[in-house]
Structure formats: structure tokens, C-alpha cells
């Protein structure tokens, strides 16, 4: 009888434990800001736009600000290295004072090897430099193989991740994500999947997709958007994207700016005309 009672008590305790609610999963919010801004040859004009973006990010209490491809130097192979270096000191100092981390798109000539790179440079909130992602899928027009393109002017480096506090993130630049078959001499290495395999939870994509006013927009924009959404879903990734915009506000860019969630849906998306800033809190479990 005693053993039967002990068994019954144990069963009741086990049943009670099963009814207890599971502990809630801990979430961590990463507040991001993005800048859809004009990118020109004028480094000083670019700096003005970038400083406005930093001010916006600080007002939104963002952890990090993403800018478009070439947003400091201009998106040109013959960028002015001296002015870019001086501008880099100015914008990183502004971000440090504001307490905002940076994912800054710029072309840059690295002092360790003297080579030019199309970069996404990462800085922590205290201004410390975390390193850079170099564009991997450098472009050349496939239909005209004798033409010169990015691949003839810029070098690249191995894919890597970065740590923003306790969050592992990755950076990609424009064609790195969608490997446009008209502009990509290399095979598609599926860089989003590689970054997911390296533990990245969030990818920051700096874009300078080009401005068009033709039927091409009906083809290229859906291609870019579907790649963003499918690759986010495939890698269970958050993807934050910031594209350059027409300084005159007439032409549309070829890629939406905003935030795509791990289900492949837009969490936030901005209009493709004019300068736009945006902010969003990514909840990471």
C-alpha cells in the first residue's frame, strides 16, 4: 500500500510539472537605422547627408546605422582617397559622439596592401573599428566581355562576420546578394547562406542599384526584391538594406530600402524616391 501511495504522489507531482508554463524565450532588441540617400562624386555633399543620417539614428536611439554602397567616397573607381580618408575621420567621430554604430558603405584604398576595395566598414558605438566586408561579386557586363567593370578596379577579401555586442552580423554589398546573371562573371556562392552558416543573425546590405526610367525597372526591381525575400527566408535571416537615391528625386532606384524578416516578408519598406531615413527594432530570440 505504501509503495502504491508513493507512486501516486510521484505521478501527481509529474503531472503538475507538465502543467507549468514553459519559461519565455529571452529576446534581445537590435535597433537599426537606415539611410536611403544620394551618393555623388562630391565627398563633402555625401558627408552632409551622412551626418543628417547619424543625427536621425541618434534621435531614434538606434544601435547601428546602415548607409548605401559608396555613400562616403562616391560609387566610382577613381574616388578621391585623400578626401575619403578625411571624411571617414569626420563621420566616424560624429557617430562616436552620437553613440551610434556604423555599417558604412565606401570605396577605400587599404594601407596594408595599397589595393582598392568596395567596402562596408563596421564601427562599434564607441567608435572602435571592427573591420570591413569587401564586395565579393564584383560586376562586369557579361554581354560585353571586353568592357571594364568593378572586377577590373577593385580587389576582394574572404567573407567574414562581425560582432555587435552579443549579436553576430554580416555585411554584403549590392550584387553580393542577388548575383545578377547579366553582371556577374563568377558563379553564385550564395553568400547569405554562407553567412547564416557562420552564425549571422542579421545581414546589412549596402546597395547602389542604379537609377533607371525604362521598362528595365519592371524586370530588375522584382528580381532584386524576390532575391532579398527568398534568401532571407532560406537563411532565416534579418536583412537590412539601404539603396542610393536620385539626388533630383525623379528616377526610382532598382531595389527597395527597408527591413526583411526571416520569413521573407517586409517588416518595413520605404518609398523608392527621395531621401528617406528609417528605423526598426529587430527582436532576436
Could you say what each language-model-derived stretch is?
Residues 8-14:
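Hydrophobic helical h-region of N-terminal Sec-dependent signal peptides
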Residues 1-8:
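Bacterial N-terminal signal peptides that target proteins for export
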Amino acid at each position: 500500500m505504501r509503495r502504491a501511495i508513493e507512486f501516486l504522489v510521484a505521478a501527481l507531482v509529474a503531472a503538475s510539472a507538465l502543467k507549468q508554463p514553459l519559461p519565455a524565450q529571452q529576446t534581445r532588441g537590435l535597433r537599426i537605422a537606415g539611410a536611403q540617400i544620394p551618393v555623388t562624386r562630391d565627398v563633402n555633399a555625401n558627408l552632409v547627408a551622412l551626418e543628417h543620417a547619424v543625427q536621425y539614428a541618434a534621435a531614434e536611439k538606434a544601435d547601428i546605422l546602415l548607409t548605401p554602397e559608396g555613400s562616403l567616397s562616391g560609387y566610382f573607381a577613381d574616388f578621391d582617397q585623400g578626401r575619403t580618408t578625411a571624411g571617414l575621420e569626420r563621420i566616424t567621430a560624429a557617430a562616436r559622439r552620437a553613440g551610434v554604430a556604423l555599417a558604412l558603405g565606401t570605396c577605400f584604398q587599404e594601407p596594408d596592401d595599397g589595393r582598392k576595395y568596395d567596402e562596408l566598414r563596421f564601427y562599434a558605438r564607441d567608435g572602435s573599428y571592427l573591420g570591413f566586408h569587401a564586395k565579393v561579386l564584383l560586376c562586369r557586363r557579361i554581354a560585353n566581355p571586353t568592357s571594364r567593370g568593378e572586377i577590373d578596379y577593385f580587389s576582394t577579401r574572404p567573407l567574414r562576420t562581425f560582432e555587435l555586442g552579443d549579436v553576430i552580423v554580416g555585411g554584403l554589398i549590392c550584387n553580393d546578394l542577388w548575383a545578377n546573371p547579366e553582371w556577374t562573371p563568377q558563379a553564385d556562392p550564395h553568400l547569405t547562406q554562407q553567412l547564416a552558416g557562420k552564425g549571422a543573425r542579421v545581414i546589412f546590405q549596402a546597395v547602389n542599384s542604379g537609377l533607371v526610367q525604362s521598362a528595365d525597372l519592371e524586370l530588375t526591381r522584382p528580381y532584386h526584391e524576390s532575391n532579398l525575400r527568398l534568401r532571407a527566408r532560406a537563411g532565416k535571416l534579418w536583412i537590412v538594406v539601404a539603396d542610393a537615391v536620385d539626388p533630383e528625386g525623379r528616377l526610382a532606384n532598382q531595389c527597395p530600402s527597408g527591413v526583411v524578416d526571416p520569413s521573407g516578408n517586409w517588416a518595413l519598406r520605404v518609398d523608392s524616391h527621395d531621401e528617406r531615413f528609417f528605423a526598426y527594432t529587430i527582436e532576436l530570440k
